[in-house]
Amino acid sequence: MVAACSPLTRVSEVPYEALCQFLYQEARLLDQRKFDEWNDLFAEGGMYWIPLAEDQEDPVNHLSLAYEDSMMRQVRINRLNHDRAWSQKPRSRTSHTVSAIVVESICEVSNQLFVGSAFTVAEWRSFGHR
């Protein structure tokens, strides 16, 4: 994803607070079930990856919980928003908490910024939380 910078901005000039706000906004969009707006945060060609293992570095040659391009993210969004999504009856309420936000590396050549964070997700359903 591209965080808080226009094509004319060098990533090294993006304030740390803007990076944090970007991640907080992402969490809020998910909690508010604004999945289309969340999907719009991705840069063209951006991938959504949830590694299966904590130390997994490669999403292609190893199993992942999710590794989705734009089309597959849209399929997921359509399924979650569909009236027949029985697994979402009643719909989940979530709380995403983002912390430990760090700039892991900056690549001036490609104008890319790599940011890491920790997050937790709490989900509430009519039968309790998990």
Please tell me what each predicted stretch does.
Residues 3-4, 18, 27, 43, ...:
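A sequence-composition feature that detects small, non-aromatic residues
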Residues 3, 95, 102-130:
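A beta-strand edge to alpha-helix "cap/lid" segment located at domain peripheries
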Residues 2-44:
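Short, low-complexity N-terminal intrinsically disordered segments enriched in polar/charged residues
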Residues 44-113:
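A solvent-exposed, acidic/Ser-Thr-rich amphipathic alpha-helical stretch
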